[in-house]
Curated annotation (Swiss-Prot):
Name of the protein in question: Large ribosomal subunit protein bL34
Highest taxon listed in the record's lineage: Bacteria
Species for this entry: Lysinibacillus sphaericus (strain C3-41)
Keyword Transmembrane helix included in the entry's annotation: no
Keywords from the UniProt entry: Ribonucleoprotein, Ribosomal protein
Biased composition (Basic residues): 26-44
Sequence intervals crossing the membrane: none
GO biological process: translation
Amino acid sequence: MKRTYQPKKRKHSKVHGFRARMSTKNGRKVLAARRRKGRKVLSA
């Protein structure tokens, strides 16, 4: 049986990347929350 996670850099960035987060209002909320929490890495 094939494993469910077949990593692809392009897709990962498109869905979870910084520019993807910045492109929507809720994505910006996510980044703000991660900044507030003090995350070293904000996005993938």
